Amino acid sequence: MTIIVGIDPGSRVTGYGIIRQQGRHLTYLGSGCIRTVVDDMPTRLKLIYAGVSEIITQFRPDCMAIEQVFMAKNPDSALKLGQARGVAIVAGVNQDLPVFEYAARLVKQTVVGTGAADKKQVQHMVRSLLKLSASPQADAADALAIAITHCHFNQSLLRTSAAKVNPLAGRLR
């Protein structure tokens, strides 16, 4: 059994989602958004760090999955996103969590089936996959999708690792 916290970083809104993976079964544990309503960037970063740290303390995940930075049209936005992402990663690393990174297109491809999916499609599939009664907020749904993606790739890695250490694996045809 593994608990994963997914993080969708943003300088104004950082989404988070927590799921438990038991084999192929996923269970929703919680999700939400850390909203920073102040204007100065250092205070926003402090609030993101504190919020992510609190979530980690509350849910005690085994690992963190976070969205990779993508190239934004506005360089200032990309820098702010990178800073928000950095403090979220530090919050995880400071609590000894391994951190895994996934590209947004890969997350959409894994959860929806197309890397060009829009937010509504991601929300719908997250709701369906986790059997939720309502769609989560967009940023929380993105964070849950990141956690789901990690589960998908973690299962693949576990199968690959088992095949490598299984003495019978070489005999299977």
Swiss-Prot record:
Superkingdom field: Bacteria
GO BP terms, alphabetized: DNA recombination; DNA repair
InterPro entries the record matches: RNaseH-like_sf, RNaseH_sf, X-over_junc_endoDNase_Mg_BS, X-over_junc_endoDNase_RuvC
UniProtKB keywords: Cytoplasm, DNA damage, DNA recombination, DNA repair, DNA-binding, Endonuclease, Hydrolase, Magnesium, Metal-binding, Nuclease
Main location: cytoplasm
Residues making up the signal peptide according to the UniProt record: none
Reactions catalysed: Endonucleolytic cleavage at a junction such as a reciprocal single-stranded crossover between two homologous DNA duplexes (Holliday junction)
UniProt cross-references to Pfam families, sorted A to Z: RuvC (PF02075)
Listed PANTHER family: CROSSOVER JUNCTION ENDODEOXYRIBONUCLEASE RUVC
Protein name: Crossover junction endodeoxyribonuclease RuvC
Organism: Pectobacterium carotovorum subsp. carotovorum (strain PC1)
